[in-house]
Amino acid sequence: MSGSMASAAVQEAAKKGLYTFVKHFALNDQENHRGDGQDAAAATWSGEQAIREIYLKPFEMCMKLDPVELNYVEKQDDGSYKNATTTIPACNALMTSFNRIGVTWAGGHYNLLTGVLRGEWGFNGFVITDANGYLGRMDPRQMIEAGGSGSLRYLKDTQFTFDKDSVSDYHYGRKAAHSILYTIANSKAMNGAMPGSTLVGTPTDKQLRVLLTILPALLLVLLVYRIFRVW
């Protein structure tokens, strides 16, 4: 039932050009104590047969959905462009879980992310961790080397630090960036983008905080001014 419901939602969203983060991968069947902070978390133990036939099956069903059509603009030999259509996987995004599988955090589990998800199921998309800002055990380096794409985090001291002199950092960083860009490119996020287009980013969190601080202050000043004018 889980697989059927998730598959239906993922496929219909994909037909509209959306990518859907299927979660939480995997064996995350309880909310209590799944991630109590720092190094504490639920550790799930199971045999391989049960994992494959029960706990991974809904995710596998999503990964093996029929492909969907995507419209795009194709460059011609004469330099002109025309509308074209291709097929893409219906499921291109996934979120890992807080818990451990055995003693290994699911979001940094090589056999799960690279062995099964990317290797056996042929998944090429975006793998993100569950949201956390302080959990030391959810190591970003472990995540990226296991086959993950990015961490859903907000504190600088928990983010992946790229070493420009490290060959392995370039290797894993390139693979992670490719999976993210692949997912975005194969969605309606790039709809209408042509050579020469200018992509404008959204405001940063700092800009938004400044705006949300100044705007109420200005409204308060105007309100006080109107009150005193009435009197």
State what each model feature region is.
Residues 1-231:
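Glycoside hydrolase catalytic-domain context in secreted enzymes
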